[in-house]
Design a protein with these regions (language model features):
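Short, well-formed alpha-helical segments that are part of the catalytic scaffolds
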Residues: 7, 12-27, 314-315
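A conserved acidic beta->alpha catalytic loop
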Residues: 22, 38-46, 63
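Glycine-rich, basic loop-to-helix element that forms the pyrophosphate-binding segment
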Residues: 60-78, 99
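Short aromatic/hydrophobic "clamp" motif used to bind/position activated sugar donors
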Residues: 83
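Conserved donor NDP-sugar-binding/catalytic core segment of glycosyltransferases
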Residues: 91-127
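Short, flexible, basic/aromatic active-site loop/helix in glycosyltransferases
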Residues: 132-171
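A short, conserved alpha-helix in the catalytic core of glycosyltransferases
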Residues: 164-167, 172-222
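Active-site-adjacent helix/loop segment of glycosyltransferases
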Residues: 207-285
Length: 333
């Protein structure tokens, strides 16, 4: 088996079906298998999708195990040369996987690989390339210096904004939304750390791949990632869980500095969480009173991912109907 694709789902049935539809074309010509680990969804994901996706192996959990443990359940069932951790809210181009596998085959020391992710508005997702969140790198991000100087090699290292978007590059942290790994590298580095329930586990595993002597790479082949569509990033719960995950990472890899880091990191967690709580409460009150500004797009953005021939037809359709569209051309194998 060349490739095993592991998808962890939780109440994202419609996104998951779109993801699977894109994968069916992407795996053509590849010896691949697809696993969906459902974390006890309330939207009947397994019941609704299992019958119409008979080539997919569904595993229904009796409760929510979290991202790391659910992925590990899938990984342990596979013996493929490469493993891909893929978010259910993604759409993969028909040649994305072939390009990634070809790159990994040609770079024997590549332990992990990430790709160029596009957000639902068509812009580049900054987490496509990230640097290791050392204490100083994390400090620069939390205090806003990373956002102010995104292309600076030191201040902007969290998102590695100094790297070109259209060229392959060595990076440090791969996003768990699309994380392809070599089996031998994964065996040496170990599976995802299940102390992380959600967020941070991709950072931890990426770091362990580097510490095991492998390289992590960014490849500019594009996928669509609906990040934020099912998660309110400004919510109290999201901010608290995210920064708690960062605290677990710091304790694990920078334990010798924990005396100096625990207090400021904890302070950052609760400051960010409190700010998010105030913001969401304020927005709720404004919305209730009718003062909330309309943030809806006047015109939706359409993203077409296909071959050059198909894109030409899509472009004509968009032009005739005045659609705001972006086009991703995949190469014909």
């Amino acid at each position: 088996m060349k490739l095993a694709i592991i998808i962890v789902s939780y109440n994202v049935r419609h996104y998951l079906q779109q993801c699977l539809d894109s994968l069916y074309r992407a795996v053509e010509g590849i010896d691949a298998e697809i696993y969906v680990i459902d974390n006890h969804s309330k939207d009947n994901t397994v019941k609704k999708l299992k019958g119409k996706n008979r080539g997919v192996k569904f595993i229904a959990c009796n409760h929510n195990h979290g991202f790391a443990k659910a992925n590990n359940m899938g990984i342990r069932r596979t013996k493929s040369e490469y493993v891909l951790l893929l978010n259910p809210d993604t759409i993969v181009g028909e040649n994305t996987l072939k390009e990634c596998i070809r790159f990994m085959d040609e770079h024997e020391n590549a332990g992990g690989l990430g790709v160029r992710m596009l957000k639902c508005n068509g812009s580049d997702a900054m987490e496509s390339r990230r640097g290791l969140p050392t204490p100083m790198t994390a400090f620069y991000k939390m205090c806003g210096l990373c956002a102010k100087y995104p292309t600076h090699k030191k201040l902007g290292k969290y998102y590695m904004g100094y790297l070109p978007w259209d060229e392959p590059a060595k990076i440090e942290i791969i996003s768990g939304a699309f994380m392809m790994m070599r089996r031998t590298a994964l065996d040496k580095a170990g599976l995802l750390d299940e102390d992380f329930f959600m967020y941070g586990e991709d950072i931890d595993l990426s770091y362990r791949l580097l510490k095991s002597g492998f390289d992590n790479w960014y490849l500019p082949t594009k996928i669509l990632h609906y990040k934020g569509e099912s998660t309110q990033k400004s919510s109290f719960k999201y901010v608290h869980v995210f920064y708690e995950a960062m605290l677990i990472f710091f304790k694990k890899h920078y334990g010798h500095l924990s005396i100096w880091l625990n207090m400021p990191i904890k302070a950052a967690i609760y400051l960010k969480a409190t700010t998010a709580l105030i913001k969401t409460t304020s927005e709720h009150i404004q919305k209730t009173l009718g003062f909330m500004p309309d943030r809806r797009r006047k015109s939706p953005l359409y993203i077409f991912i296909s071959t050059k021939e198909s894109i030409s037809r899509c472009r004509s359709l968009a032009d005739r109907n005045g659609l705001d569209a972006q086009y991703i051309v995949t190469q014909t194998p």
